[in-house]
Amino acid sequence: MSRMAEQQLYIHGGYTSATSGRTFETINPANGNVLATVQAAGREDVDRAVKSAQQGQKIWAAMTAMERSRILRRAVDILRERNDELAKLETLDTGKAYSETSTVDIVTGADVLEYYAGLIPALEGSQIPLRETSFVYTRREPLGVVAGIGAWNYPIQIALWKSAPALAAGNAMIFKPSEVTPLTALKLAEIYSEAGLPDGVFNVLPGVGAETGQYLTDHPGIAKVSFTGGVASGKKVMANSAASSLKEVTMELGGKSPLIVFDDADLDLAADITMMANFFSSGQVCTNGTRVFVPTKCKAAFEQKILARVERIRAGDVFDPQTNFGPLVSFPHRDNVLRYIAKGIEEGARVLCGGDVLKGDSFDNGAWVAPTVFTDCSDDMTIVREEIFGPVMSILTYESEDEVIRRANDTDYGLAAGIVTADLNLAHRVIHQLEAGICWINTWGESPAEMPVGGYKHSGIGRENGVMTLQSYTQVKSIQVEMAKFQSIF
């Protein structure tokens, strides 16, 4: 693909040049080619976007619930019509295989938008009788202008997960995509405008997180920040949001999730689940189950089943329908993952497979890392303690149920957890003791629109998806009505 035209900001229904004068490049990680130069939003651009959003939000919130619902449903239709085009752009920008982006990223994002479009008319207050002459009623009102700050691993899906409930509740959103993968968020802005969203209700500001993101979290005109990213960045976003104007926050942060295989499990099923929990999206999924706990007596057999399935991984041309494994999202990220692999070897973990870059003409110019499985791991190893966010699995052994629960919970993270067992009594007993916000039994990874998604401990605050997220983009106003004569004590 030839280099794209320079990408601008999207403010008030159209493209506009950044006043900052700064730019950055977005790279195709499969081959190292520059896709586009992208303009970076500065402080003045954030001010412009906030003013635009404030104007548009008043128009949007004044529309009836059904009018807003119809516009969002129209956007869903356009997303589905343009699925292949958007998936190709997402593949170029992220490096993910087209077989994945064409069936998951836009599809699931559109599902979430459709879900919230359907919930809009059900967003209602309540009536509370006090006595014969007085009652209270409540209204759920939009927050106003909110900010979404996205991660690089699911660019358009995250933009939809954040914008769908925000817009459904009557807010306007200013969205800052990751500077690593900014392209499809701009296309989403076009689609919202085409669907009839009033100008300013969805503005997109590409830029560097440490600058553009901080301008958003500092801005007094922003009522809430929804952030997806790492724990360290999340803490800064939360601190800035509180210090500036006590903004509400939703944080979807990192994870180091446990996947527990019990001794009664079908090992073929367990191996299939483990592969998806570690190597889907080349391991760049925040919920990945990278700490795989296996009974000691099952370890050897389980390892053989994993190795057999690693042979089925097909890396190569990311647009080949048979490819199911792409490069990492960037060269700096690849280098960071390789440092973790080297650390695992240094600390005594045994490499079962992988452990290096992929080599060959198809891989030499890209950010490719081989699917890597470590075994003979211990809980104190760096690769077991820290989030790697790449195709790196750690196999650990255990002897008892109590032991594995304790070790699974021995982490600052609490995003996800899963177990594989034929005993549903055991499944529920263990799941109820695991300290994680998203749990799976005999499956892994699905996050439907109806399912609240978020973490315990350092893995996040608040939830995305589900009914409660729509409510989190509103504020409750309580109104008391008195029909009898008011009595004053003065």
Swiss-Prot record:
Keywords for the protein's UniProt record, in alphabetical order: Metal-binding, NAD, NADP, Oxidation, Oxidoreductase, Potassium
Transmembrane segments: none
Record's cofactor remark: Binds 2 potassium ions per subunit.
Keyword Nucleus: no
Enzyme class: oxidoreductase
Gene Ontology annotations of biological process type: glycine betaine biosynthetic process from choline
Cofactor(s) demanded: K(+)
The protein's Enzyme Commission number: 1.2.1.8
GO molecular function term, any single one: betaine-aldehyde dehydrogenase (NAD+) activity
Function: Involved in the biosynthesis of the osmoprotectant glycine betaine. Catalyzes the irreversible oxidation of betaine aldehyde to the corresponding acid.
Subunit structure: Dimer of dimers.
Protein name: Betaine aldehyde dehydrogenase
